[in-house]
C-alpha cells in the first residue's frame, strides 16, 4: 500500500514517465515493473538493465582505524577494496550471524561508504 509518507527517489518522475508500476518498499516509492517480466528479462539479457538504488542506506565510516573496524565486522577482506574500489560482504551480528549484506566503497584516506539494504539500515547503525 502506498502511503503519503513514502519517499520518492531522484528517478521517481522518470519511472512514472516510463509507465512503471510503482510500489511502496520500506518507505520508498519504487518501480516494480514496466512491461512484462519476460520482455524486461530479455531486454536485460540482450541490451542493458538499470536498477534504481537511491533508496539504499548509505553509512560513512571514517578515521584512522576505520579499515580495522570494518575488517572485524565484515567477513570479506576489506583490503581488497583499493581506493575507488568496492567489496561486497556479509555483515556479522554480535553472535556471528548475518545482520545484512553490504557494498563497502573505499573512498580513500581512511574513509569508507557502506551501502546497506533499506530494510536493515537502522539495525546496521
Residues covered by each model-derived region:
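Basic, glycine/lysine-rich polyanion-binding surfaces/domains
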Residues: 1-125
Amino acid at each position: 500500500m502506498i502511503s503519503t509518507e513514502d519517499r520518492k527517489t531522484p528517478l521517481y518522475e522518470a519511472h512514472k514517465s516510463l509507465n512503471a508500476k510503482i510500489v511502496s518498499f520500506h518507505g520508498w516509492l519504487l518501480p516494480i515493473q514496466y512491461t512484462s517480466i519476460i520482455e524486461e528479462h530479455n531486454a536485460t539479457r540482450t541490451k542493458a538493465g538499470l536498477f534504481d538504488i537511491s533508496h539504499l542506506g548509505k553509512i560513512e565510516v571514517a578515521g584512522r582505524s576505520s579499515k580495522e573496524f570494518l575488517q572485524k565486522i565484515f567477513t570479506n577482506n576489506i583490503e581488497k577494496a583499493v581506493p575507488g574500489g568496492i567489496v561486497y560482504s556479509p555483515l556479522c551480528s554480535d553472535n556471528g550471524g548475518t545482520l545484512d549484506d553490504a557494498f563497502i566503497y573505499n573512498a580513500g584516506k581512511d574513509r569508507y561508504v557502506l551501502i546497506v539494504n533499506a530494510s536493515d539500515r537502522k539495525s546496521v547503525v
